[in-house]
């Protein structure tokens, strides 16, 4: 097996799919065919995109699966258009496809009749479930379409290279054939829509002016009008049918391609999690809309040209004027649409930032509550929201202009044309005037769809840029080199590695230069420039590997140079982290890796996993990986699925793994044993349980190389010891194991120990050899003294099964607990299913929205403005008909001595009067339009902002149990997708809907005014309409709801996959995660596609009603020949023609607007149903400002359970902690240690008893008053995106000197001082640009600053090496000498110095005394734990 040489020639991969090019010394020779499955082909010989993707994942391809997947339209034996052409048969009798859309003939496609069966089911049942909905057609499946799009993108990259590659061009090629066809259908629509008014209506009106009646001729005209309208309606439906399928294919393809790319990324640091979620939710939607609506733009110019030619023929040169108005308005509307899109683009950036911030808040909500920082975070989100609102308002004004212009343009064009026409002395008849008005009306179609089209295309253009930047990000390197000797598993020769430009981990000691990050406040424009610079910088790095871009600590330029030249490029620098690493790891060896915080331990592991950039030397690997990350990654799935991780269930191996990882006692108390569902990020597990499940996953995977990154730090001492012996030493005996740890006692048993310092391996050998060497390792080991004291509990089995009664987290997202005994399996479900609304959107939801917009009065004002607006438009058309009627035979003129009756309008002596009022109506209309636009935008924005603020307030004030049972993806969905609907789409649709409803009523009213008998015909049509509406309403609403609830799972899948990227890479599970994603996406696409089709299904049927109305009007004109003035006949027919498209559009808007209101309903559901914590502050009950002065803590019969119906986790706990006392709290996982903290912070309210601090009952005071006086250093360090300063002091309460002092005492001053912007340096999302140890030190600095009287330490030094640990313990002792301190410990040596030790078991205090008393009693539990530990140190030390 030959491999890619990653030696001196190793390069940073070029962006895109060609990220690891073959570089061989024998460049001309071609590799053997059978070797190809482990490498990527040369770009020019690129085969199927799936193979390329599979190779990137390092997967072999099963031939049968491969051939099965290659059945694409292109490879169909009858040609790639076979499926499409078979749809041209008018009616198809065979039903060989599973989805009815694939069996539909042309007639069924045009009328969407294939959907009728689902409409019947929906009507019958009153609701729809996923079982009722057809799964997606194979032609729309994301898998098939993604491979096609991927192939086209690959070809584009090969032809022009990544920089010049155009994703727009690729998307166009992907959709080209179908879009061209849809444009052809659109042309037919436009021609039919134009010829109806231009020819049929004109002849009908001329017939009304004629004196003789000719019934046969006139009925033929009505029939002609009927046929042109049917052709117009059905060809338009066919356009939509084509566009929707194209859109669904494009959305599925590009979203799958995006996720595929995310799975292959080294890291996602260039993009925030919020941005990736937005790309995969909103941007996918934008692509669909562009494909669905974008092509309608082509219809505009055609109608404009036809209309202009026709008007000139009818009116002469003045006909140009009206068309000129249209032509001028067209670019004006385009400009307004472009401006809307420009503001939308700015808005998207603000939304990204808000969603990212929300994601952070939700992830660390427990910590935010504990620190009483809710207000600070609330203000930061509100600040971003204010900026977003400002941009939304500007976008809203321009959007309102584009929405309201279409009906006005007809009036303006008519006024200008007819006024000038008459002023110039030309005559005007009713036939001429109303034919021109009717043609103008048909021309408004172009103006109506223009805002939609331009908006969708502009937004898609932004989305395409975001997708392209994602597709060009660098991929992970799967190291393919094999070591020379078969017995060596990992070989590194003189390897120098760096975190590349997009990675952020500092991962080096404070003495090394931490990576510079750009100042977050730099403008967005600068960010784009930097991204472009980044690509050129890549080449610069290659050319200059030892140059100034790769600075070591001793090569740093002066601060002045730094500032001038490098600050804006800070994040582009490759930060050398590992230097000249020489390492050979033999097969079957257990290798321990240790070193101080930031010495490069995690970097070494990342290098082996291919996540760093190799600058010099080589790396060779032989074997497959299992990886246990420092912070365990848990899926939202059952506990068993988390361990199996896609492998077959083997009972014997599975049971052996459970025993090795001490998981049996945990299973005994979980509601459904190993079938219990685990919440997102392991929300309902303790830190120790998460770590053990992660370890069990590694053991079960049966790989050859095991990489364990500090896996025992979160475990109780005796559990850790058992796992080290049974899992790592015994279970993995024949495997190669890299074991990173801070717990030095385990290194005694390792075959080899590697000691790291400042990114170098400084000592290496067995434990004995390193002790004899008397170097850094020996010094630290001797300093340990008693060392870690992990006991092997004497009666471990009996003890563990009895003592572990609950499991709950000490990490940032937790607070759940399990039952004491096995219960009904359904109780194993922690995460509740998402609620799905029933029936129609209740009126109360509309009421809530109206109330939020300003109440009933504001609503009435807005409605009155709409009425006046549409009324002024209708008035101007009526005035024209009145003017024509007055000029038709009512005027007497004198020629010479003769007086005669003239029917010419130009002879009317009051022409000036009529013309003035006609022109004035236009001015009034424009003023009303402007007022209405401003008032409407203000109202809807006030509504959405109030809903957002109230939702946000409710979420922040919800108790912890809500966050434990609700996936973050679901809550985020409210703030991203639902908020996007309420902010942007709902106002857009509601404005058009209200305007059109009023217009429909005016149309029917005008026609009925001319022909009262018309109302008789309207009756049956109203009944037909009601039936249609009842049926379609259920169908459309239910499909929209299904679309909403299938959206959350695939967003949650993206979130969780991104968080576990390193684990997915290590286990090579990319393909499985991709398949799961495709399933979830297709599950969402199925109801989404049917929802869009259901709209058109309704539209086609409504068109038949409006065609019936126009035919009725035509028949009335024919049958009442000579009884009504031609001017009024013209008025009636012009409104009837206007009604055709308008009617179905309005009803569709009604359904769509109701569907958009489901987002308001979902937001309102949270606002109404979420229970709230106690108030932050309670008037008249606030404690004194200097409370607590002493720090005495008293528990009196305290009882607590996490949620209703769950067992107690604290049972009648009573004790008193004296002021300034230092208490160590020990006990098995689930004994209730962290529950004490939860009770003290009131994250969970007590079920009985009380807690007092300095005699004040904490349940009587406000939460903020309580929590701001307590401090906690959590087990898992929490840093927020922002600056170092904002992380330490979000309220700006402390001086710079105080902050530097806190950093100095936590040994972080040097590290922060070396950052270019010092305290203002950027902290990335999750604190990813600091190592875990450094994050923990910053958390301790934060607690030092707060300096509260009561401090809880939740095993705060678990992620630190022993040396730093000892220093920090000393700092804490000194700094908090006058504080009451509770230390929740896993490692016994951390609590030996405590004044008293509390031993917990099963939620009760079983021992509470000084360490000396407990150790002198040989029957105490603490003694048993300590004796075992003492024994181990004595033997091993």
From Swiss-Prot:
EC class (word): translocase
UniProt catalytic activity: ATP + H2O + xenobioticSide 1 = ADP + phosphate + xenobioticSide 2; 3',5'-cyclic GMP(in) + ATP + H2O = 3',5'-cyclic GMP(out) + ADP + phosphate + H(+); 3',5'-cyclic AMP(in) + ATP + H2O = 3',5'-cyclic AMP(out) + ADP + phosphate + H(+); N-acetyl-L-aspartyl-L-glutamate(in) + ATP + H2O = N-acetyl-L-aspartyl-L-glutamate(out) + ADP + phosphate + H(+)
Binding of ATP 2, residues: 1227-1234
Cystine pairs: none
PROSITE patterns per the UniProt record, alphabetical: ABC_TM1F, ABC_TRANSPORTER_1, ABC_TRANSPORTER_2
Domain ABC transporter: 562-783, 1193-1427
Annotated InterPro entries: AAA+_ATPase, ABC1_TM_dom, ABC1_TM_sf, ABC_transporter-like_ATP-bd, ABC_transporter-like_CS, ABC_transporter_C-like, P-loop_NTPase
Residues annotated with Phosphothreonine modification: 513
Subcellular compartments: Basolateral cell membrane; Golgi apparatus lumen; Endosome membrane; Cytoplasmic granule
Primary localisation category: membrane
Annotated glycosylation sites: 494, 636, 684, 890, 897, 1044, 1329, 1417
Segments crossing the lipid bilayer: 179-199, 219-239, 296-316, 317-337, 400-420, 434-454, 608-628, 848-868, 917-937, 997-1017, 1018-1038, 1104-1124, 1127-1147
Tissue spec. comment: Ubiquitously expressed, but levels in brain and muscle are especially high. All isoforms are equally expressed in retina.
Membrane topology (UniProt): Multi-pass membrane protein
Chain residue ranges for the region called Disordered: 15-41, 501-538, 794-827
Domain ABC transmembrane type-1: from-to ranges: 179-459, 859-1155
CDD domains the record matches: ABC_6TM_MRP5_8_9_D1, ABC_6TM_MRP5_8_9_D2, ABCC_MRP_domain1, ABCC_MRP_domain2
Biased composition (Basic and acidic residues): 19-41, 795-827
CC per GO annotation: apical plasma membrane; basolateral plasma membrane; endosome membrane; Golgi lumen; membrane; plasma membrane
Other information: Although other labs have confirmed the ability of ABCC5 to transport cGMP in an ATP-dependent manner, they obtained a much lower affinity for this substrate. The authors conclude that ABCC5 is a low-affinity cyclic nucleotide transporter a major function in cGMP excretion is unlikely.
Similarity comment: Belongs to the ABC transporter superfamily. ABCC family. Conjugate transporter (TC 3.A.1.208) subfamily.
PANTHER family for the chain: ATP-BINDING CASSETTE SUB-FAMILY C (PTHR24223), ATP-BINDING CASSETTE SUB-FAMILY C MEMBER 5 (PTHR24223:SF196)
Protein's UniProt name: ATP-binding cassette sub-family C member 5
Lineage, top ranks: Eukaryota, Metazoa, Chordata, Craniata, Vertebrata
């Amino acid at each position: 097996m030959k491999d890619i040489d990653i030696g001196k020639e190793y390069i940073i991969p070029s962006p895109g799919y060609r990220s690891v090019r073959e570089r061989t010394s024998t460049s001309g020779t071609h590799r053997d065919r059978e070797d190809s499955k482990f490498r990527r082909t040369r770009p020019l010989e690129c085969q199927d995109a799936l193979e390329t993707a599979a190779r990137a994942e390092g997967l072999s391809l099963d031939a049968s699966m491969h051939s099965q997947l290659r059945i694409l339209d292109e490879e169909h034996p009858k040609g790639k258009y076979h499926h499409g052409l078979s749809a041209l048969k008018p009616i198809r009798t065979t039903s060989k496809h599973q989805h009815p859309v694939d069996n539909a003939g042309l007639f069924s496609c045009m009328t969407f009749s294939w959907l009728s069966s689902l409409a019947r089911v929906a009507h019958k049942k009153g609701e729809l479930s996923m079982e009722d909905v057809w799964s997606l057609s194979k032609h729309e499946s994301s898998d098939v379409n993604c491979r096609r799009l991927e192939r086209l993108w690959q070809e584009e990259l090969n032809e022009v290279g990544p920089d010049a590659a155009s994703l727009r061009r690729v998307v166009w090629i992907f959709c080209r054939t179908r879009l061209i066809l849809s444009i052809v259908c659109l042309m037919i629509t436009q021609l039919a829509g134009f010829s109806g008014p231009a020819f049929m209506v004109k002849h009908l009106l001329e017939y009304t002016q004629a004196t003789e009646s000719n019934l046969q001729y006139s009925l033929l005209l009505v029939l002609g009008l009927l046929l042109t309208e049917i052709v117009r309606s059905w060809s338009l439906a066919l356009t939509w049918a084509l566009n929707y399928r194209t859109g669904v294919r494009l959305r599925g393809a590009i979203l799958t391609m995006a996720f595929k790319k995310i799975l292959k990324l080294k890291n996602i640091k260039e993009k925030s999690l919020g941005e990736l979620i937005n790309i995969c939710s909103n941007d996918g939607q934008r692509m669909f809309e562009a494909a669905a609506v974008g092509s309608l733009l082509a219809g505009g110019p055609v109608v404009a040209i036809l209309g202009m030619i026709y008007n000139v023929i009818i009116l002469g040169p003045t006909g140009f004027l009206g068309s000129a108005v249209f032509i001028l308005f067209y670019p004006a509307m385009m400009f307004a649409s472009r401006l809307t899109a420009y503001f939308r683009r700015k808005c998207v950036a603000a939304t990204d930032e808000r969603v990212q911030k929300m994601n952070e808040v939700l992830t660390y909500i427990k910590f935010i509550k504990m620190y009483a920082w809710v207000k600070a975070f609330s203000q930061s989100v509100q600040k971003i929201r204010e900026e977003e609102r400002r941009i939304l308002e500007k976008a809203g004004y321009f959007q309102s202009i584009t929405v309201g212009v279409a009906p006005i343009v007809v009036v303006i064009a008519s006024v200008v044309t007819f006024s000038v026409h008459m002023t110039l002395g030309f005559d005007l008849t009713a036939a001429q005037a109303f034919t021109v008005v009717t043609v103008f009306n048909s021309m408004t179609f172009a103006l109506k769809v223009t805002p939609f089209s331009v908006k969708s295309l502009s937004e898609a253009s932004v989305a395409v840029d975001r997708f392209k930047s994602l597709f060009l990000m660098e991929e992970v390197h799967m190291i393919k080199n094999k070591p020379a000797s078969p017995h060596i598993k990992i070989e590194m020769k003189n390897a120098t590695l760096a975190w590349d430009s997009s990675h952020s981990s500092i991962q080096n000691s404070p003495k090394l230069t931490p990576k510079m990050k750009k100042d977050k406040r730099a403008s967005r424009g600068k960010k784009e420039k930097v991204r472009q610079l980044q690509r050129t910088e890549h080449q610069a790095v290659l050319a200059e590997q030892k140059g100034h871009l790769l600075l070591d600590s001793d090569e740093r330029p002066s601060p002045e140079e730094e500032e001038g030249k490098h600050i804006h490029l800070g994040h582009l620098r490759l930060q050398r982290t590992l230097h000249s690493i020489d390492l050979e790891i033999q097969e079957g060896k257990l290798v321990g890796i240790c070193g101080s915080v930031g010495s490069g331990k995690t970097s070494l592991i990342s290098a082996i996993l291919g996540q760093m950039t190799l600058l010099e030397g080589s790396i060779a690997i032989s074997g497959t990986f299992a990886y246990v990350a420092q912070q365990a990654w848990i899926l939202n799935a059952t506990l068993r699925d988390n361990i199996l991780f896609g492998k077959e269930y083997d009972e014997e191996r599975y049971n052996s793994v459970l025993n090795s990882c001490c998981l049996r006692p945990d299973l005994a108390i979980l509601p459904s044993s190993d079938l219990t569902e685990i919440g997102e990020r392991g929300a309902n597990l303790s830190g120790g349980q998460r770590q053990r499940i992660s370890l069990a996953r590694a053991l079960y995977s049966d790989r050859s190389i095991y990489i364990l990154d500090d896996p025992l730090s979160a475990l109780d001492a005796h559990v850790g010891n058992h796992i080290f012996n049974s899992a790592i030493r015994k279970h993995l005996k024949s495997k190669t194991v890299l074991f990173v740890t801070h717990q030095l006692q385990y290194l005694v048993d390792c075959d080899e120990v590697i000691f790291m310092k400042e990114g170098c391996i400084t000592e290496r050998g067995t434990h004995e050899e390193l002790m004899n060497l008397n170097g850094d390792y020996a010094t630290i080991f001797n300093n340990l003294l008693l060392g870690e004291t992990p006991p092997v509990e004497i009666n471990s089995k009996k003890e563990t099964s009895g003592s572990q009664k609950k499991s709950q987290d000490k990490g940032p997202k937790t607070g759940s607990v399990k039952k004491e005994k096995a219960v009904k399996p359904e109780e194993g479900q922690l995460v509740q299913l998402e609620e799905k609304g029933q029936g129609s959107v209740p009126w109360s939801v509309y009421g809530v929205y109206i109330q939020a917009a300003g109440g009933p009065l504001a609503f009435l004002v807005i409605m009155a403005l709409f009425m006046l607006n549409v009324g002024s438009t209708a008035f101007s058309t009526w005035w024209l008909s009145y003017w024509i009627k007055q000029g038709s035979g009512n005027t007497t003129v004198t020629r010479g001595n003769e007086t005669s009756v003239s029917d010419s309008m130009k002879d009317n002596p009051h022409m000036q009067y009529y013309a003035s009022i006609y022109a004035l109506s236009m001015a009034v209309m424009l003023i009303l339009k402007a007022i209405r636009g401003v008032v409407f935008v203000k109202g809807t924005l006030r509504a959405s902002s109030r809903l957002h603020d109230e939702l946000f307030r409710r979420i922040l004030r919800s108790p912890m149990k809500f966050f434990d049972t609700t996936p973050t993806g679901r809550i985020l969905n409210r703030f991203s997708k639902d908020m996007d609907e309420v902010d942007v789409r709902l106002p857009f649709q509601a404005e058009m809907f209200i305007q059109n409803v009023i217009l429909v009523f005016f149309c029917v009213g005008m026609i009925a005014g001319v022909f009262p008998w018309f109302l008789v015909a309207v009756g049956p049509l109203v009944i037909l309409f009601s039936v249609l509406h009842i049926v379609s309403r259920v169908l459309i609403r239910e499909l929209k709801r299904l679309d909403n609830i299938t959206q959350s799972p695939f967003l949650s899948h993206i979130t969780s996959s991104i968080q576990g990227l390193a684990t997915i890479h290590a286990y090579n599970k990319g393909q499985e995660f991709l398949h799961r994603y495709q399933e979830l996406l297709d599950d969402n696409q199925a109801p989404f596609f049917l929802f869009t089709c259901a709209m058109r299904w309704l539209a086609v049927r409504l068109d038949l009603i409006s065609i019936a109305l126009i035919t009725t009007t035509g028949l009335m004109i024919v049958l009442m020949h000579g009884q009504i003035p031609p001017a009024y006949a013209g008025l009636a027919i012009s409104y009837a023609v206007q009604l055709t498209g308008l009617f179905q559009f309005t009803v569709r808007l009604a359904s769509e607007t109701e569907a958009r209101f489901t987002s308001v309903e979902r937001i309102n559901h949270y606002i109404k149903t979420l229970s709230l914590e106690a108030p932050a502050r309670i008037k008249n009950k606030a404690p004194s400002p200097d409370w607590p002065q002493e720090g005495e803590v008293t528990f009196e019969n305290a009882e607590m359970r996490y949620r209703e119906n769950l067992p107690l986790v604290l049972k009648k706990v009573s004790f008193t902690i004296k002021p300034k006392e230092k208490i160590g709290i020990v006990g098995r996982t689930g004994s209730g240690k962290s529950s004490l903290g939860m009770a003290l912070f009131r994250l969970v309210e007590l079920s009985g008893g009380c807690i007092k601090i300095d005699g004040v009952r904490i349940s009587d005071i406000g939460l903020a008053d309580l929590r701001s006086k307590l401090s906690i250093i959590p087990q898992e360090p929490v840093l927020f995106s922002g600056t170092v300063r904002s992380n330490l002091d979000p309220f700006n309460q402390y001086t710079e000197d105080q902050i530097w002092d806190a950093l100095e005492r936590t040994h972080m001053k040097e590290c922060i001082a070396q950052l270019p912007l010092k305290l203002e340096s950027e902290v990335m999302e999750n604190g990813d640009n600091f190592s875990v140890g450094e994050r923990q030190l910053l958390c301790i600095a934060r607690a030092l600053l707060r300096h509260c009287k009561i401090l809880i330490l939740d095993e705060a030094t678990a992620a630190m090496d022993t040396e730093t640990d000892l220093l920090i313990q000393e700092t804490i002792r000194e700094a908090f000498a006058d504080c009451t301190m509770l230390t929740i410990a896993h490692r016994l040596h951390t609590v030996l110095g405590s004044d008293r030790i509390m031993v917990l078991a099963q939620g009760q205090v079983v021992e509470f005394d000084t360490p000396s008393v407990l150790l002198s009693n040989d029957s105490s539990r603490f003694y048993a734990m300590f004796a075992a530990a003492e024994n181990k140190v004595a033997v091993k030390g």
